């Protein structure tokens, strides 16, 4: 099992990256909450990882924090929640925001995430409620303000919007829905990562 990788960031196209680890290129899928914290192309980064083995593919998921990976592993234990849906959940909410929604039983927030219907949201509440009691109340509202500006991502509004739409579709949103989400928040000065962040925030 690959649990942690440290290497040079070669490519990033939300939600995927290519990481060079001693000459070997690893393709990883990251939730957007981890993607926001990536350095610029060519710089070193360290990610906690989880490998999912399927008949048709081996998928490697990366996380900026160990707590993100822990929640990912808890999510995929839930009936009806696969790795891609867990990725969408962690892209829409930070660990703290998700924990708060679970402890407050906020079904409406959970069902706004693509792929999470009422039954899935109810299962998440039943199976995960109480597992976040160790998290302080103040921690529920912690939100990273760091948004890296990467020269590898074209800041032109049309290019940023197209990349943001593609990323949202990859996370499970329907094309029409993704386009509407991006149009509501897109500004010429925003990078694609910033557009995605604002679109996901507005969706909740």
From Swiss-Prot:
Residue ranges of region Domain I?
1-64
InterPro entries referenced in this protein's UniProt entry, alphabetically: DNA_helicase_Holl-junc_RuvA_I, Hlx-hairpin-Hlx_DNA-bd_motif, NA-bd_OB-fold, RuvA, RuvA_2-like, RuvA_C, RuvA_C_sf
Residue numbers spanned by region Domain III: 156-204
Q: Where is this region: Domain II?
A: 65-143
List keywords of the entry alphabetically.
Answer: Cytoplasm, DNA damage, DNA recombination, DNA repair, DNA-binding
Q: Which domain of life is it from?
A: Bacteria
Annotated localization: Cytoplasm
| Any matching Pfam family | RuvA_N
Q: What is its main location?
A: cytoplasm
Segments carrying the region annotation (Flexible linker) are 144-155
Recorded GO MF terms: ATP binding; four-way junction DNA binding; four-way junction helicase activity
Q: Give me the Gene Ontology terms describing cellular component.
A: cytoplasm; Holliday junction helicase complex; Holliday junction resolvase complex
Subunit and partners: Homotetramer. Forms an RuvA(8)-RuvB(12)-Holliday junction (HJ) complex. HJ DNA is sandwiched between 2 RuvA tetramers; dsDNA enters through RuvA and exits via RuvB. An RuvB hexamer assembles on each DNA strand where it exits the tetramer. Each RuvB hexamer is contacted by two RuvA subunits (via domain III) on 2 adjacent RuvB subunits; this complex drives branch migration. In the full resolvosome a probable DNA-RuvA(4)-RuvB(12)-RuvC(2) complex forms which resolves the HJ.
Q: What does this protein do?
A: The RuvA-RuvB-RuvC complex processes Holliday junction (HJ) DNA during genetic recombination and DNA repair, while the RuvA-RuvB complex plays an important role in the rescue of blocked DNA replication forks via replication fork reversal (RFR). RuvA specifically binds to HJ cruciform DNA, conferring on it an open structure. The RuvB hexamer acts as an ATP-dependent pump, pulling dsDNA into and through the RuvAB complex. HJ branch migration allows RuvC to scan DNA until it finds its consensus sequence, where it cleaves and resolves the cruciform DNA.
The record's similarity note reads: Belongs to the RuvA family.
Q: What is known of its domains?
A: Has three domains with a flexible linker between the domains II and III and assumes an 'L' shape. Domain III is highly mobile and contacts RuvB.
Name under which the protein is recorded: Holliday junction branch migration complex subunit RuvA
From which organism does this entry originate?
Haemophilus influenzae (strain PittEE)
């Amino acid at each position: 099992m690959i649990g942690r990788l440290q290497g040079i960031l070669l490519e990033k196209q939300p939600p995927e990256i290519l990481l060079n680890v001693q000459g070997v290129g690893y393709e990883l899928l990251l939730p957007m909450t981890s993607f926001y914290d990536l350095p610029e192309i060519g710089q070193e980064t360290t990610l906690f990882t989880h490998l999912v083995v399927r008949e048709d593919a081996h998928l490697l998921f990366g996380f900026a924090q160990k707590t993100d990976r822990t929640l990912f592993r808890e999510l995929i234990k839930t009936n009806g929640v696969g790795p891609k849906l867990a990725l969408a959940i962690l892209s829409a909410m930070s660990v703290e925001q998700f924990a708060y929604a679970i402890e407050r039983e906020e079904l409406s927030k959970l069902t706004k995430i693509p792929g999470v219907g009422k039954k899935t949201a109810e299962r998440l509440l039943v199976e995960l409620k109480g597992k976040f009691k160790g998290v302080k109340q103040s921690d529920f509202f912690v939100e990273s303000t760091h948004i890296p500006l990467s020269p590898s991502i074209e800041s032109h509004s049309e290019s940023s919007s197209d990349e943001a739409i593609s990323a949202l579709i990859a996370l499970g949103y329907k094309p029409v829905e993704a386009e509407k989400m991006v149009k509501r928040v897109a500004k010429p000065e925003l990078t694609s990562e910033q557009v995605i962040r604002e679109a996901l925030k507005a969706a909740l």
